[in-house]
UniProtKB/Swiss-Prot annotation:
The gene is rpsS. Residues 76-99 are annotated as: Disordered. It comes from Pelodictyon phaeoclathratiforme (strain DSM 5477 / BU-1). InterPro entries: Ribosomal_uS19 (IPR002222), Ribosomal_uS19_bac-type (IPR005732), Ribosomal_uS19_CS (IPR020934), Ribosomal_uS19_SF (IPR023575). This is Small ribosomal subunit protein uS19. One of its GO terms (molecular function) is structural constituent of ribosome. Protein S19 forms a complex with S13 that binds strongly to the 16S ribosomal RNA. Pfam families: Ribosomal_S19. GO terms for biological process: ribosomal small subunit assembly; translation. GO terms for cellular component: cytoplasm; small ribosomal subunit. Belongs to the universal ribosomal protein uS19 family. Keywords: Ribonucleoprotein, Ribosomal protein, RNA-binding, rRNA-binding. It comes from the Bacteria. The lineage of its organism: Bacteria, Pseudomonadati, Chlorobiota, Chlorobiia, Chlorobiales.
Amino acid sequence: MPRSLKKGPFIDIKLEKRILDMNSKGEKKVIKTWSRSSMISPDFVGHTVAVHNGKNHVPVYVGDNMVGHKLGEFAPTRSFRGHAGGGKAEKGGSAPRKK
């Protein structure tokens, strides 16, 4: 369920302050954050934010099409490596044919 419009978007105060300071200075550094629930505002465009995925920080370059989404959407927390590969059937079918 989406957040109520009267409340406004959640953006971590310290993260927003760091972005605004960098915008005023014209700097482009990677910013580490643990705030996956922060909404991406138009001020974030052009910056790289390293979002924590539970194990390490994933660098996310913020583009203009990401505005309105949350930072955590771009740093996956689960890695799927495929199903177990054992017990593969012989080539040519599983059961012998009847004549």
